[in-house]
């Protein structure tokens, strides 16, 4: 499925939002116009784990292309190699699907949209655990996490034919996430409905040395969580605007400075500034400097499911049933510097990276 992975250290670009704190990971899936027409593989090991993959891609005509990516894996054997009475790994099944369509009229109009589906079911605990008779009892310990996620995404862009440096684009993403789980006597169920859209305009100031991107974004999240007998419901609505300036006088220097302003219906208005500088004095030696701010709302239960296994009770002190668990958002100021040096070792390329 994966064509490439890009890793960005530091706070990243304001165009992508305000939440990035330590870095960003962008995973590029195989594209409809360049993926294999047909690719399938099957993996089975002696422990019973089975993986099935099928990729199908085709060009429908000169303007349209589509790709279908399918994956299914299952593990039904309750392994207990160390004979402690507990499964060494969960049993269950995972199915995922991605279907993408891409449009290019060769005259500046580009479009892409698709769907993603995930259905994941996992059961762990004692090897003798039976969901039908032992669930929510002290007979035998067991846990299960059942997850369903559905996503619709798309991009629409226009590049001005006579001014290739100028473009306008719209991104959107809508998803529904549901989790039903239990960990021994602990119960946790969650539902998240999200919508995100980003309108981006890109152009130059006098010359391509001075580029800028600006636009508007809108984020909507609705959370409904049940932890044992407690319910946590919240809705976050965050409209925002941003401006980013890029200065590239030559191949050695580049500077990206950005600022965005957002308004969260729970936490109010806030500003997010960011700066990234790159300097390459000689080919193969690159210095990078970054600084900026990030802010996010922590989903304390969903991000710490592993704590439920211990059967400890999680208590939020001073609850007033408002906002996100009555807690403040996470806010971080991040700054760093790095050096990347490329060289050869026995005629093979290598890279040394130093970060602070």
Residue positions per predicted region:
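Membrane-embedded beta-barrel scaffold of Gram-negative outer-membrane proteins
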Residues: 167-181, 280, 288, 325-356
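Short acidic/polar hinge/loop motifs at secondary-structure boundaries
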Residues: 1-9, 97
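N-terminal periplasmic accessory domains that precede
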Residues: 6-7, 15-41, 52-55
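Flexible loop and strand-edge segments within Gram-negative outer membrane beta-barrel domains
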Residues: 75-96, 102-168, 174-192
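Surface-exposed extracellular loop regions of Gram-negative outer-membrane beta-barrel proteins
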Residues: 63-82, 92-94, 98, 132, 167-176, 265-267, 279, 283-335, ...
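Repeated loop/turn-to-beta-strand initiation elements of outer-membrane beta-barrel proteins
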Residues: 36-37, 63-66, 76, 107-111, ...
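Transmembrane beta-strands of outer-membrane beta-barrel pores
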Residues: 42-46, 72-76, 103, 117-121, ...
């Amino acid at each position: 499925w994966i064509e490439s992975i890009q890793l960005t250290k530091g706070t990243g670009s304001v165009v992508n939002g305000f939440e990035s704190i330590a870095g960003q990971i962008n995973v590029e899936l195989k594209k409809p116009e360049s993926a294999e027409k047909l690719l399938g593989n099957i993996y089975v090991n002696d422990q019973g784990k089975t993986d099935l993959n099928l990729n199908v891609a085709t060009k429908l005509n000169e303007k349209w292309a589509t790709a279908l990516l399918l994956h299914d894996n299952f593990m039904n054997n309750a392994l207990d190699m160390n004979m402690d009475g507990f499964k060494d790994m969960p049993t269950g099944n995972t199915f995922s699907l991605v279907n993408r369509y891409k449009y290019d009229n060769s005259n500046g109009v580009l479009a892409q949209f698709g769907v993603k589906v995930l259905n994941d079911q996992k059961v762990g605990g004692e090897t003798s655990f039976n969901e039908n008779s032992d669930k929510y009892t002290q007979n035998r310990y067991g846990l299960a996490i059942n997850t369903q996620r559905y996503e619709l995404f798309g991009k629409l862009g226009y590049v001005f034919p006579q001014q290739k440096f100028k473009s306008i684009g719209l991104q959107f993403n809508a998803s529904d996430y549901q989790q039903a789980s239990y960990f021994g006597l602990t119960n946790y169920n969650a539902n998240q409905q999200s919508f995100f859209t980003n309108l981006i305009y890109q152009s130059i100031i006098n010359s391509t040395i001075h580029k800028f991107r600006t636009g508007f974004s809108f984020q909507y999240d609705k959370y409904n969580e049940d932890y044992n007998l407690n319910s946590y419901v919240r809705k976050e609505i965050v409209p925002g605007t941003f401006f980013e300036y890029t200065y590239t006088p030559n191949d050695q220097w580049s500077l990206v400075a950005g600022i965005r302003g957002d308004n969260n219906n729970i936490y109010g208005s806030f500003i997010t500034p960011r700066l990234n500088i790159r300097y390459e004095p000689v080919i193969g030696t690159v210095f990078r400097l970054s600084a900026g701010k990030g802010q996010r709302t922590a989903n304390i239960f969903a991000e710490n499911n592993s704590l439920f296994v211990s059967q400890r009770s999680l208590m939020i002190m001073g609850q007033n049933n408002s906002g996100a668990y009555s807690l403040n958002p996470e806010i971080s100021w991040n700054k760093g510097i790095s050096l990347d040096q490329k060289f050869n070792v026995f005629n093979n390329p290598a890279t040394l990276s130093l970060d602070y």
